[in-house]
Amino acid sequence: MDSSTLIKRLETAKSSFQNLELQLADPDVASDPKQLETIARERSRLEPLVNDYLKLQIIEKECLEAKGLVKESRDDKEMELLAREELQNLELSKNELIQKLTLALLPKDPRDERSVMLEIRAGAGGNEACLWAGDLARMYERYGQKLGWNVKPISSTEADMGGFREMIISVKGESVYSQLKFEAGVHRVQRVPSTESQGRVHTSTATVAVMPEADPVEVKIESTDLEISTARSGGAGGQNVNKVETAIDLFHKPSGIRVFCTQERSQMQNRERAMEILRAKLLELELAEANAKERSARLSQVGTGDRSEKIRTYNYKDNRTTDHRLGVNFPLEQVLSGQLEDVIGACIAEEQKRQMEELSNQSED
């Protein structure tokens, strides 16, 4: 982004911020709690950006003063040296602030602040794939716990030999989607299964879908499009297990999506949870369609977000995790223990780099 485009966008943000301040002082706005909350939230979002812009203006003024001092001190070498050192420090602070402001102005995904549902499905590899799906679930659980997120399995189908055929995990917290969206795709593992007597390395896969939670208003579901039946639950039902039909089997006819929910203790809770999962799945379908259209206009990006894209290989023999989108290796044990900060951070940095290149190309056009 060139400097003129940056300043123009910062001035627009500053004007918007000042306008919001005026609205907050309006008695009519103060008497409308909903409008007041919306305006206050937008003001809070813009405040750090505007404050940094004001800092930039101050530093630019100080840079001009320092340059003037350098010229005035040419006859005093010691003073000139001090002035040049001060100018160098100011220029460094200025460039760091410009970089920060540029990143802050990059397009934001409106869903980044949302909680998500992770759907992990065993792929190729039979029993070993089911075990691998369980390993991935534990990896995300550890990562979420480190960040203080609330991670809870809400639907699962266990495999006969251990692990899971599929599992849906609710991950609630601040800006969850902004990080976990880079985990969508096929995760491939290369290792020797515990049942392998010859010591041969097997390759198995599991698929991860990352679904931002959908608001009921955002995804409209007609009751006539649903087929709902109940079943006896084998979940956390205590004495009610196999006596009361608490499980919900929900089928959405237009999309063909089926959700079977057994984790909650009551039929009503399972129904609410099943509807929550269905809304997230339907929103994912909409996003996939929108992303496909957007990708056709892009030259590159950090992954497609598609659940069929192979994004990572976990090689046990070499103790290596390879992210194929980045072409970078990470320590296997570190990643599986839930230390995903470096991997996800690298994906975010690469995405920001791509966005900055797009903005630069747009400004040149």
UniProtKB/Swiss-Prot annotation:
InterPro entries: PCRF, Pep_chain_release_fac_I, Pep_chain_release_fac_I_sf, Prokaryotic/Mito_RF, RF-1. GO terms for cellular component: cytoplasm. Methylated by PrmC. Methylation increases the termination efficiency of RF1. It is found in: Cytoplasm. SUPFAM superfamilies: Release factor. Keywords: Cytoplasm, Methylation, Protein biosynthesis. Pfam families: PCRF, RF-1. GO terms for molecular function: translation release factor activity, codon specific. The modification N5-methylglutamine is found at residue 239. Disulfide bonds: none annotated. NCBIfam families: prfA, PRK00591.1. PANTHER family: LD18447P (PTHR43804), PEPTIDE CHAIN RELEASE FACTOR APG3, CHLOROPLASTIC (PTHR43804:SF8). Belongs to the prokaryotic/mitochondrial release factor family. Peptide chain release factor 1 directs the termination of translation in response to the peptide chain termination codons UAG and UAA. This is Peptide chain release factor 1. The lineage of its organism: Bacteria, Bacillati, Cyanobacteriota, Cyanophyceae, Synechococcales. The gene is prfA.
